[in-house]
Amino acid sequence: MINNKIGGRNMVGRAVNRLAGRLTAVALTAAMAVSMLAGCAAGGKNTETAAKKEDKPSAMEQMNAKNDPNVIQDNYRTCYEVFVYSFFDSDGDGIGDLKGLTEKLDYIEGLGCNEIWMMPIMPSPSYHKYDITDYMNIDKQYGTLDDFDALITECHKRNINVIIDFVINHTSNEHPWFKAAADYIKSLPDGAEPDPSECPYVDYYNFSKTNTGGYNQLPGTNWYYESQFVDSMPDLNLQSEAVRGEIDKITSFWLDRGVDGFRLDAVIYYNNNNQTETIDDLTWLVNNVKSKKAD
């Protein structure tokens, strides 16, 4: 009997425990459901808030919009230098050309560049083109003047300015000016001095009977000519009015074709390093160009 009573109480206790467990489970489930609903509601608000934040321009975007650069007022540009020879070949001859450069303007624009500085593009016997034989043409390896005009048009459509290397400190020794001057010097009798009235081109260069620094001997004569770099690049006499007259025609030629400016090469070597004369030359050149294109 005693055992039966004890067993009955145990059975009642287990039943109560099972009921309590079920009630606890129900309560926990309800609590979890409420929590999940609250979380979903909160998450929805957070997503909506994030979306609103994404729609709003960032502080940097707002600042850039307020400070959109005005190139007309400040003339600052992000410039991309192009060595045409090795840039992009459009015809498969292994040498870059103007058509190839034109094909890649979208790439250059995509970099954020709004100016191109073209290394020398004028006719020259060398690959680098710094020894020029004709200042008013395009080297045939690079294309034609028509190709250049097309390049300028496409650049300006994209608000890309074009500046070209303007090598006026020297020419090639194959330039017609130097060839005429050299032939004239070689024809002079012993003791005779060059006369620009007989050969105007002799005044385009600096000839001397003294072998000073930066001069090379003219083959077959006792005369020397200034050539600060190498003997194949005779230096121009930038103080000559005749040379300045040629430069005036050259700047007009390229500005009329749409060039936006010129880059001058190796100015510290002008006039055999005579700073006073160089400043005079540069002042004259700047005034000359600005009289044709103020910006």
Question: Model-found features: residue ranges?
Answer:
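Receiver (REC) domain switch/active-site residues of two-component response regulators
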Residues: 260
